[in-house]
Curated annotation (Swiss-Prot):
<feature type="transmembrane region" description="Helical">
    <location>
        <begin position="31"/>
        <end position="51"/>
    </location>
</feature>
<keyword id="KW-0812">Transmembrane</keyword>
<keyword id="KW-1133">Transmembrane helix</keyword>
<comment type="similarity">
    <text>Belongs to the TMEM88 family.</text>
</comment>
<protein>
    <recommendedName>
        <fullName>Transmembrane protein 278</fullName>
    </recommendedName>
</protein>
<feature type="region of interest" description="Disordered">
    <location>
        <begin position="1"/>
        <end position="25"/>
    </location>
</feature>
<keyword id="KW-0472">Membrane</keyword>
<feature type="transmembrane region" description="Helical">
    <location>
        <begin position="107"/>
        <end position="127"/>
    </location>
</feature>
<feature type="compositionally biased region" description="Acidic residues">
    <location>
        <begin position="1"/>
        <end position="14"/>
    </location>
</feature>
<dbReference type="GO" id="GO:0016020">
    <property type="term" value="C:membrane"/>
</dbReference>
<feature type="transmembrane region" description="Helical">
    <location>
        <begin position="53"/>
        <end position="73"/>
    </location>
</feature>
<feature type="region of interest" description="Disordered">
    <location>
        <begin position="141"/>
        <end position="165"/>
    </location>
</feature>
<dbReference type="InterPro" id="IPR033355">
    <property type="entry name" value="TMEM88"/>
</dbReference>
């Protein structure tokens, strides 16, 4: 394509076949190697921060899940075995179930498994809190939340040193 044809296409506003599809980069006055360390440290900081957040999320999610699974698995297995061997659930239980358990024994297993779940949930919660307390230095800090604001104290409260008992809130657990 000649120079004259290019000029006429540019004047008309029509794109030519040989025109570049993407805009060209502007020439920079600064050298890119000067900015590379700055960009690398910013990118690395973002990567480390998001990595810590992901590890913290997984620890706070997987730790309770693992503890509760390990503690509650025996009770769930007992309930499953009770349902597996009961004749109303399976019309023809296997020969092992018939040899080991009657329908009354299967019902007893189901009841025992379900009644053992609440104490095991409490035990799992205690084990989780113990693990969190021991792993606190390794776990990332939770997100910062603003401190609750206290209402301004009146001059009467300051003179007594204690707020009125009616205004004071106590919660017993």
């Amino acid at each position: 394509m000649s120079e004259q044809e290019r000029e006429t296409e540019e004047d008309e506003g029509v794109a030519s076949d040989t025109a570049p599809m993407l805009p060209r980069r502007r020439p920079t006055d600064y050298h890119i190697s000067v900015l590379a360390p700055i960009l690398a440290t910013r990118g690395l900081g973002t990567l480390v921060l998001s990595g810590r957040a992901l590890v913290g999320f997984l620890l706070h999610l997987l730790l309770p899940g693992t503890v509760f699974l390990l503690v509650l698995l025996p009770a769930a297995a007992v309930v499953y075995l009770g349902f597996l061997c009961h004749s109303r659930v399976h019309p023809a239980p296997g020969p092992r179930c018939r040899a080991l358990l009657s329908d009354r024994g299967s019902a007893a297993l189901i009841v025992f498994g379900l009644l053992s779940l609440p104490p095991l949930v409490v035990l799992a919660a205690a084990a989780r809190s113990l693990l969190v307390r021991r792993l606190r230095p390794a776990l990332p800090d939770p997100a910062r939340t603003p401190a609750p604001r206290r209402p301004p104290r009146s001059s009467g409260d300051l003179a007594d040193g204690h707020p009125d008992e009616d205004k004071q809130l106590c919660a017993w657990v």
